[in-house]
Structures are given as C-alpha cells and as structure tokens.
UniProtKB/Swiss-Prot annotation:
UniProt-recorded Gene Ontology molecular function terms: bis(5'-nucleosyl)-tetraphosphatase (asymmetrical) activity; GTP binding; nickel cation binding; phosphatase activity
EC numbers for this chain: 3.6.1.17
GTP-binding recorded as keyword: yes
Gene expressing this chain: prpE
Protein name (Swiss-Prot/TrEMBL): Bis(5'-nucleosyl)-tetraphosphatase PrpE [asymmetrical]
Record key words, sorted: GTP-binding, Hydrolase, Nickel, Nucleotide-binding
Lineage: Bacteria, Bacillati, Bacillota, Bacilli, Bacillales
Family per record: Belongs to the PrpE family.
NCBIfam families in the cross-refs: PRK13625.1
Organism the protein comes from: Geobacillus kaustophilus (strain HTA426)
Catalytic function, reaction form: P(1),P(4)-bis(5'-guanosyl) tetraphosphate + H2O = GMP + GTP + 2 H(+)
Entry function: Asymmetrically hydrolyzes Ap4p to yield AMP and ATP.
Domain of life: Bacteria
SUPFAM superfamilies: Metallo-dependent phosphatases
Length: 245
C-alpha cells in the first residue's frame, strides 16, 4: 500500500494543490491523480478559517467517490456536518468562513454542496485502519487500546484528543500528550494540534503543521515514512502552535 496522508487543510486549497503536485500528482482530470497509483489520505478538518473550504469539499468528495483517497472526519468536519443537518451550532471558531462561502452560492449549488458533504461524512469511518492493521489515520490520534472501538469515549478522543475537561486561558481544551503513552504496533498518523514541524513520537506522527496559521501543509508518505511540506501563504500566528517538552 502506498498512500500520501495530508494534514489539516482548513480551506487552504492553493497549498493543497501545490503539495499534491510536489508529491507527483497530476490534475489533468480536475482532481489529483498519481501516475503510480498512490492514493491520498486526509486526517480531517478540510474546511474552516481558510479561503477555499468549498473547493476542498468538492475535491475530496470526488476523490473518495473514485476510490482515490481515504478520508476521516475531524472536529471541524463534525461541526459542519451538524450545521448542514440544521442543528443549532455556534457559527464561530472558523465555521463562519465556510458558512460565508456557502451563503454566496445560489440555493441549488448550496444544496449540492450540502448533500455531497453529508454523504462524505456519513460514509466515512471514525478512523481508518489500513494496510492490514499496520496504519491508522485518526484526526486527533487514538490510544492503542481504543483501536477497533467506536463508542462515544473513543469518538471524543479521535475528534478532540485526550482532553482533561479543563480549559486553557485562550479557551482551548487542555490535552494530555497521549502520543508519549502510545504502545501500539500500528503507525498512527494524525493532526488536530498544530506543531511547527512534523512530530514523530514512537509510532505516531502529527502532521498538522498549521497551514492555516502560516506554517506549512505537510504530507506523510507511507510506507516510506518521509514528510513533504509546502509553505503556507497565510499570516504566521505563533501562538497557535503547540510546543512539547
């Protein structure tokens, strides 16, 4: 199995296009296709904050429908899904940018995007177990003893990380560094928490290098376990990046 797993995109379509081209994908058919049959993987959080969230929805839906990509949802995907279902969600923390894009469309196009994303989300696994169990893609990561489970506790972990219930001063949840306690044999590739460079800890890799906050968009090439990044065009916001001791 050969897959290029891409970190949190958050509507940064230009960087996504540049990264896929750097990885050797061709866009002749309107979506990135690799001549050697490699597939793309997405750790979720396709939308919000960046300028082209709807473009990302269209591209990923097309790739998944053609069996050219693996997609798992992130917490921002979960919130957008609930918005599209008509649930009462707070249109903030980035969702407002996607909703603003969405509301510029005529009603027929709004309905098409809404249906596409709902189908993408509902058909996606909570996390993807690939290569006969040797690789797991999970938005915020997953504990080794949670692999194989999909109960509420596991869903919270996969979407939000190992949260304590406490809050930081900036309003973000306090999270434990679960990767240091991961003892599974599978590689876990995840994002969710922006770091300035890809973070390898044991058999875990955080590839969210904060593209929407001015960092970079990163892919992990599997099974090579090499990272490839392209710089962000967004302003750099240093306080959005987490450092680990």
């Amino acid at each position: 199995m050969q897959v290029d797993i891409i970190g949190d995109i958050h509507g940064c379509f230009r960087e996504f296009a540049a990264l896929t081209e750097t990885l050797g994908y061709h866009w002749d058919e309107g979506v990135p296709i690799h001549p050697d049959g490699r597939k793309l993987g997405f750790v979720g959080d396709l939308t919000d904050r960046g300028p082209e969230s709807l473009n990302m929805i269209e591209i990923v839906c097309a790739l998944v429908e053609r069996n050219l990509a693996y997609y798992v949802p992130g917490n921002h995907c979960n919130k957008l899904y609930r918005f599209f279902l008509g649930r009462n969600v707070q249109i903030a923390h980035g969702l407002e940018t996607t909703v603003a894009e969405y509301r510029t469309l005529p009603p027929s196009e709004q309905e098409m995007i809404r249906r596409k994303f709902i189908r993408l989300y509902e058909q996606a696994p909570l996390y993807a177990v690939l290569d006969e169990g040797r690789l797991v893609i999970a938005h915020a990561g997953i504990r080794h003893d949670y692999i194989g489970r999909t109960d509420k506790k596991v869903k919270t972990f996969v979407l939000y990380g190992d949260i304590t219930g406490e809050m930081n001063q900036d309003g973000t949840p306090v999270r434990r560094d679960w990767a240091k306690r991961y003892h599974g044999s599978a590689w876990v590739v995840y994002g969710h928490t922006p770091v300035e460079k890809p973070r390898f800890v044991g058999r875990t890799v955080n590839i969210d290098t904060g593209c929407v906050f001015g960092g970079a968009l990163t892919a992990l090439r599997y099974p090579e376990m090499e990272t490839v990044s392209v710089p962000s065009s967004m302003p750099f916001v240093p306080e959005k990046f987490r450092t680990f001791s």
